[in-house]
């Protein structure tokens, strides 16, 4: 057999031309220790703070401690099969979660994966869990209300779109109930809701989801869950994931409401991670940056102006402002609002609704303490009619509390003082409300008008509740158009005042309560 050198050289050239070498450089490291969900890695020289590190088995860890000779990272999910010597890689990405309308009506975990058994989640893309809050120039002042459906809150502690209002109180004082009712009340308001459950029992979350479904509010709500059985890393990141999902609506000129239930458990999870990473502990063993943990989250709740929305949507949405309203929940121990985390969150938020165990146990529910509850946005976020009618309620309750304390020591009281005490008791009774029964603006206005104009004077204290129920039923039956008008416009003028007076005069004449 004769070898032709030309043929051989051609064949070699052909093979060389077809030879395809793809060189891929990636930063690789080695696990040197695994304990309590924390891994220490050698060799990741170029890793960034907060970067996702790819682990064997399609899992990830997040780099939190960048030290001279190693990287401390927290594992997202189970870590039992990770061992010393395993190879890990940098990804060059930070954690992102799916966002979009497809998430409405779904229950997802911190990573945006469905946990409700309804199949895969449709999304409009992904968004980073950590985002920079809108700047000063991009914001607009808060002047539109978010109606919670609670008389005591909407009258005395009004919440505006884009506000951060803290709900604070001991365990079992109705904090979650208040937040869930606020979500239920947004059924027809166009406000999209996000409920973030942090460190709660799975049975409690299932109950909340069932209640939202029963009241027709789940369809416009995203539920983000990091239960008590999940890792500290997932509990720490859950609020940021929920916030990214809420920002999707804010940045497109829509209104959204987000509930963080509760941030005390998130702070505990973050404390656990920090101590395991051997960061120096501070007050109550929390790390030094626990204030920043909450401030960077809550600053993302804002009302953004039309220019911001137009720039974000590249001109698709014009002339619309967007908002993300936050209702963070904090659990106190024995009413101590001066503890570390409660004082931090109080100083970050635009007001707080303080729920008291003593009021709750006395049957005053919602157990709002009007003395130390405040909204720093105030009347700017109220409808005209609520602003006009609610002014005297807070004053009446403040005077009542003062006189009630004084009357314990005084044996004989004059008529004026007795009248004020009686009025205060009736207003307190009137502000009671059952769970899952939010009220419209018109219904609240009618009830407040009755209290403000002295229509409760001759009603027995025990009959105030039945008087209110009968009055609302009468108004719904006989004056539905007026109630509809008030709900749509929120206006208050002499004509509406005369009509409200007419309703109450006619109703009181019937004596049907």
Curated annotation (Swiss-Prot):
Pfam families: ATP-synt_ab, ATP-synt_ab_C, ATP-synt_ab_N. It is found in: Cell inner membrane. Keywords: ATP synthesis, ATP-binding, Cell inner membrane, Cell membrane, CF(1), Hydrogen ion transport, Ion transport, Membrane, Nucleotide-binding, Translocase, Transport. Its EC number is 7.1.2.2. Gene3D superfamilies: 2.40.30.20, ATP synthase alpha/beta chain, C-terminal domain (1.20.150.20), P-loop containing nucleotide triphosphate hydrolases (3.40.50.300). ATP binds at residues 169-176. It catalyses: ATP + H2O + 4 H(+)(in) = ADP + phosphate + 5 H(+)(out). It is a peripheral membrane protein. The record marks 373 as: Required for activity. InterPro entries: ATP_synth_asu-like_sf, ATP_synth_asu_C, ATP_synth_asu_C_sf, ATP_synth_F1_a_nt-bd_dom, ATP_synth_F1_asu, ATPase_a/bsu_AS, ATPase_F1/V1/A1_a/bsu_N, ATPase_F1/V1/A1_a/bsu_N_sf. It comes from the Bacteria. GO terms for cellular component: plasma membrane; proton-transporting ATP synthase complex. One of its GO terms (molecular function) is proton-transporting ATP synthase activity, rotational mechanism. Its main location: membrane. F-type ATPases have 2 components, CF(1) - the catalytic core - and CF(0) - the membrane proton channel. CF(1) has five subunits: alpha(3), beta(3), gamma(1), delta(1), epsilon(1). CF(0) has three main subunits: a(1), b(2) and c(9-12). The alpha and beta chains form an alternating ring which encloses part of the gamma chain. CF(1) is attached to CF(0) by a central stalk formed by the gamma and epsilon chains, while a peripheral stalk is formed by the delta and b chains. Belongs to the ATPase alpha/beta chains family. Produces ATP from ADP in the presence of a proton gradient across the membrane. The alpha chain is a regulatory subunit. This is ATP synthase subunit alpha. It comes from Yersinia enterocolitica serotype O:8 / biotype 1B (strain NCTC 13174 / 8081). The lineage of its organism: Bacteria, Pseudomonadati, Pseudomonadota, Gammaproteobacteria, Enterobacterales. The gene is atpA.
């Amino acid at each position: 057999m004769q070898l032709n050198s030309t043929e051989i050289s051609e064949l070699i050239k052909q093979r060389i031309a077809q030879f395809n070498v793809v060189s891929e450089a990636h930063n690789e490291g080695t696990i040197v220790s695994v304990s309590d969900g924390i891994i220490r890695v050698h060799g990741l020289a170029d890793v960034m703070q907060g970067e996702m590190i790819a682990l064997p088995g399609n899992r990830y860890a997040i780099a939190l401690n960048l030290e001279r000779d190693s990287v401390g990272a927290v594992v997202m999910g189970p870590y039992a099969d990770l061992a010393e010597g395993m190879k890990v890689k940098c990804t060059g990405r930070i954690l992102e979660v799916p966002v979009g309308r497809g998430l409405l009506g779904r229950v997802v975990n911190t990573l945006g994966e469905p946990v409700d058994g309804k199949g895969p989640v449709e999304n409009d893309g992904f968004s980073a869990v950590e985002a920079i809050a809108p700047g000063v120039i991009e914001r607009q002042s808060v002047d539109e209300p978010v109606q919670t459906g609670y008389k005591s809150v909407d009258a005395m502690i009004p919440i505006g779109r884009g506000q951060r209002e803290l709900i604070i109180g001991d365990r079992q004082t109705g904090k979650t109930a208040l937040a869930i009712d606020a979500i239920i009340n947004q059924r027809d308001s166009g406000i999209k809701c996000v409920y973030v459950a942090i460190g709660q029992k799975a049975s409690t979350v299932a109950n909340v989801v069932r209640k939202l479904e029963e009241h027709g509010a789940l369809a416009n709500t995203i539920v983000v869950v990091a239960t008590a059985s999940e890792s500290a890393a997932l509990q720490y990141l859950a609020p940021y994931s929920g916030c990214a999902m809420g920002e999707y609506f804010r940045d497109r000129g829509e209104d959204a409401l987000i509930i963080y239930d509760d941030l005390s458990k998130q702070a505990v999870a973050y404390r656990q991670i920090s101590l395991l990473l051997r960061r120096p502990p501070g007050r109550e063993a929390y790390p030094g940056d626990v204030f920043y943990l909450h401030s960077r989250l809550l600053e993302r709740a804002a009302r953004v102006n039309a220019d911001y929305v137009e720039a974000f949507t590249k001109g698709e949405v014009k002339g619309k402002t967007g908002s993300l309203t936050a209702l963070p929940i904090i659990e106190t121990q024995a009413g101590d609002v001066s503890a570390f985390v409660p004082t931090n969150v109080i100083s970050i938020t635009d007001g707080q609704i303080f729920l008291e165990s003593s009021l709750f146990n006395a049957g005053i529910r919602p157990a709002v303490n009007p003395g130390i509850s405040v909204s720093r946005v105030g009347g700017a976020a109220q409808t005209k009619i609520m602003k006009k009618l609610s002014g005297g309620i807070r004053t009446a309750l403040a005077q009542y509390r003062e006189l009630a304390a004084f009357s314990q020591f005084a044996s004989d009281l004059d008529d004026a003082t007795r009248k004020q005490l009686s009025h205060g008791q009736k207003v307190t009774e009137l502000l009671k409300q059952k769970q899952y029964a939010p009220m419209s603006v018109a219904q609240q206005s009618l009830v407040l008008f009755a209290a403000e104009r002295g229509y409760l004077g001759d009603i027995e204290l025990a009959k105030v509740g039945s008087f209110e129920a009968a009055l609302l039923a009468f108004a719904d039956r006989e004056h539905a158009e007026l109630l509809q008008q008030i709900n749509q416009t929120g206006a208050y003028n002499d004509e509406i005042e005369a009509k409200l007076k007419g309703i109450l005069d006619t109703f009181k004449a019937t004596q049907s309560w």
